[in-house]
């Protein structure tokens, strides 16, 4: 398990570095207003994916050990196509500010992205974490290569370079996933069983509960973008989105751990083992994340202005406000994957609902008055409420003593020893 976590973390770190370079390139070329347009475009695609992943989401990971590939794949693909068509036609009702020329692209990109995600979740469900990680890493690699050609070699400065880059990233990732699952795809049409009632029932059952939480969580995490666009302007969205992206990079630690944790729990039947595993991973995740957040908070405004451009110096102030909530949300990510792994998706939904109440009340109150500062306060409080809700229920149902929540030196030494062992083994394998 530890080896898979290390591999996942390494992949996510590499992807984060590339995504950071992408953010820098877009900020320098497009400016704060153009970066705001890009952030809203990507966020709108993510909004459509919430509905696609009612069937094509994390429920695939949970159901992969229990249903044939063909049935899950066919049901997921048809559903994602339907959602892309419906949402593509009605997306401007949700976001009237989306440029008409981008509507069709948003619809098509959401469909291709969903196909790529289906492959990714099959790989995770089979606990083929290495392959899933390589599949994920390909997206930012293809994106930055496309952006480099479009903006640096061709010297263009419009948003369509980013759109073309997304096409390359999503489609390339999908093709790689097909290759990694080629045995399953080769047998796709050999299975003559056309009874999809059971798999559809399970996909909707688990997917609806899980995606309800993701739908609510989407507004917790990204409603501030749309409120800033409505009450202030896209330039403020650009600065705020960059600050959020940098701060949320801390979640690479917890999401790397949670991905392996989720696959392990979904394939295990021991509740006590799942609880102990979750607690141990939460403690080490918090310790590492706290150190990383301190480093981010110490960086001055001049650093961000130098890296992203003179319009982005305000990122430092935003990141410092977000920091406590970012740290608390690390706990939410680990505990949320615990509840998803045991099939209790509704717990994540209830936690997200609590956070959404905070987001709506504070967002509509603070953002029109305090712009990005109000948005940062809103997000930080919402993140914290999410984590507290799940933590309270987790400690109530788990039989842990108070001192079990303390990270001991012996545990740190064990983690370090395990890391050394895995790196040593990896070096030996490479020789």
What are these regions (language model features)?
Residues 4-15, 40-41, 45-97, 101, ...:
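Membrane-water interface segments that mark the loop-to-transmembrane alpha-helix transition
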Residues 104, 130, 134-135, 155, ...:
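Interhelical loop/hinge segments that connect adjacent transmembrane helices in multipass membrane
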């Amino acid at each position: 398990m530890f080896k898979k976590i290390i591999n996942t973390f390494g992949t996510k770190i590499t992807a984060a570095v590339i995504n950071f370079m992408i953010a820098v390139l877009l900020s320098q070329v497009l400016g704060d207003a153009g970066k705001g347009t890009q952030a809203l475009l990507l966020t709108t695609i993510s909004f459509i994916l919430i509905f696609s992943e009612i069937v094509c989401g994390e429920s695939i990971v949970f159901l992969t050990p229990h249903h044939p590939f063909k049935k899950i794949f066919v049901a997921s693909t048809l559903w994602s196509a339907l959602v892309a068509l419906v949402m593509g036609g009605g997306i401007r009702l949700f976001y009237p500010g989306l440029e008409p020329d981008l509507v069709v692209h948003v619809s098509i990109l959401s469909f291709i992205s969903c196909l790529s995600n289906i492959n990714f979740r099959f790989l995770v469900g089979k606990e083929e974490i290495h392959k899933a990680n390589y599949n994920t890493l390909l997206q930012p690699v293809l994106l930055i290569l496309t952006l480099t050609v479009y903006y640096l070699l061709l010297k263009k400065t419009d948003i369509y370079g980013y759109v073309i880059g997304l096409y390359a990233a999503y489609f390339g990732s999908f093709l790689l996933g097909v290759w990694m699952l080629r045995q399953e795809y080769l047998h796709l049409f050999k299975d003559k069983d056309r009874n999809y009632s059971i798999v559809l029932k399970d996909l909707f059952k688990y997917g609806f509960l899980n995606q309800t939480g993701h739908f609510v969580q989407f507004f917790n995490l990204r409603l501030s973008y749309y409120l800033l666009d409505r009450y202030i302007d896209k330039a403020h969205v650009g600065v705020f989105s960059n600050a959020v992206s940098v701060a949320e990079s801390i979640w690479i630690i917890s999401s790397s751990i949670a991905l392996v944790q989720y696959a392990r729990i979904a394939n295990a039947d021991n509740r006590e083992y799942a609880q102990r595993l979750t607690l141990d991973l939460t403690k080490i995740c918090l310790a590492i994340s706290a150190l990383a957040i301190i480093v981010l908070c110490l960086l001055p405004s001049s650093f961000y202005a130098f890296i992203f451009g003179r319009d982005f110096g305000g990122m430092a102030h935003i990141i410092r406000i977000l920091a406590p909530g970012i740290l608390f949300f690390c706990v939410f990510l680990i505990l949320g994957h615990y509840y998803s792994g045991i099939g209790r998706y509704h717990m994540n939904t209830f936690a997200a609902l609590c956070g959404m109440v905070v987001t709506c009340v504070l967002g509509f109150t603070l953002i029109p008055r305090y712009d990005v500062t109000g948005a940062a306060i809103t997000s930080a409080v919402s993140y914290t409420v999410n984590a507290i809700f799940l933590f309270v229920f987790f400690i109530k149902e788990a039989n842990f003593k108070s001192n079990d929540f303390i990270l001991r030196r012996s545990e740190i030494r064990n983690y370090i020893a395990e890391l050394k062992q895995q790196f040593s083994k990896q070096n030996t394998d490479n020789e």
